[in-house]
Amino acid sequence: MLLFVIRHGDPIYDPDSLTPRGHLQAKALAKRFAVHGLDRIYASPLIRAQQTAQPTSEVLNLPIQIEEWASENLAWEEFTVKYSGDFLHWVFFRQNTEFRQNGDELLGNGNWKDAKSVQEIKDLENCYKRLEKGSDAFLERLGYKRESCGIYRILKPSEERVALFCHQGVTLLWIPYMLGIPPHLFWSSFDVNHTGVSVFEFKNNPNGITSPKCISFSDNSHLLLEGLPYQFQNEIDL
């Protein structure tokens, strides 16, 4: 199975929607996916994710199935911290060096919650439980049951191409869990762009277990092909 995780296009957060640029980015995505196709399309319940998925849905004549657990609003409640001036924002927006200092760089999956850089998460002990449950149920429905950190039992070998249109917050929180990487170390080094396409291969190994491998990360080549601005977060020319 190939799992495509796509961030929504250039957003308007209030009211929840896409900018004109975001709609053009979504149309560029549809042309990208028209080349090799998809078998299933899933999306967050939020409008900006569904609007990003809509052109691809129309081109491929596939319905958009909603995954409630992939809502960024839910993740926001679990993974935001206070910055100076009581400004609330994502924990992964800290200066990235903080995740690799004071011994935090030595912590792994078993003890990452001891990292000094994550202590301000309001319910640190339980912050991942909802996302873990949603991820595990989603992947098990697709034929891959989580057995341990980054290891999945192959219940039903699949060659399907599956897309989930979601969010920066959801992607940066979910991917380290799915891959079995300490989240604070992942946050220190990775980010995703508007309509960035990340691809994960679930190889159907003969011994019945698999570990998802990232074979492409936050790819935006579709923007170049359509002559759209090729920037990170509308700020950095790429």
Residue ranges and their predicted role:
Residues 167:
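Short basic (Lys/Arg) and small-residue
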Residues 1-71:
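Active-site-proximal alpha-helix that buttresses catalytic centers in soluble enzyme cores
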Residues 36-39, 141-157:
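Surface-exposed helix-capping loop/turn segments at secondary-structure junctions
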Residues 39-45, 153, 161-164:
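Short glycine-rich phosphate-binding loop at a beta-alpha junction
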Residues 11, 170-171:
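Short active-site segment of divalent metal-dependent hydrolases/proteases
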Residues 61-144:
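Phosphate-handling substructures
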